[in-house]
Amino acid sequence: MAKSKNHTAHNQTRKAHRNGIKKPKTYKYPSLKGVDAKFKRNHRYALHGTAKALAKARAEKSA
């Protein structure tokens, strides 16, 4: 008896492209899950300082 075929790529690219090969979605704010706790803590304070500076700049601009 003849040996059976182990693998073929026939039709695989056609199947893949029927719905289009899409890039994974990237989001504006990626999750911080799994990020170092020390970094996340400092990041929180840094964001707060940035928000205060922006608020002050807006107040000075409008005044």
Curated annotation (Swiss-Prot):
Keywords of the record: Cytoplasm, Ribonucleoprotein, Ribosomal protein
Sequence ranges of Basic residues compositional bias: 1-26
Subcellular location per the Swiss-Prot or TrEMBL entry: Cytoplasm
One GO MF term: structural constituent of ribosome
GO biological process, one term: cytoplasmic translation
Domain of life: Eukaryota
Cellular component aspect of the GO annotation: cytosolic large ribosomal subunit
Region (Disordered): 1-35
Pfam family, one: Ribosomal_L29e
Protein family: Belongs to the eukaryotic ribosomal protein eL29 family.
Subunit structure: Component of the large ribosomal subunit. Mature ribosomes consist of a small (40S) and a large (60S) subunit. The 40S subunit contains about 32 different proteins and 1 molecule of RNA (18S). The 60S subunit contains 45 different proteins and 3 molecules of RNA (25S, 5.8S and 5S).
Function: Component of the ribosome, a large ribonucleoprotein complex responsible for the synthesis of proteins in the cell. The small ribosomal subunit (SSU) binds messenger RNAs (mRNAs) and translates the encoded message by selecting cognate aminoacyl-transfer RNA (tRNA) molecules. The large subunit (LSU) contains the ribosomal catalytic site termed the peptidyl transferase center (PTC), which catalyzes the formation of peptide bonds, thereby polymerizing the amino acids delivered by tRNAs into a polypeptide chain.
Official protein name in the record: Large ribosomal subunit protein eL29
Origin organism lineage: Eukaryota, Fungi, Dikarya, Ascomycota, Saccharomycotina
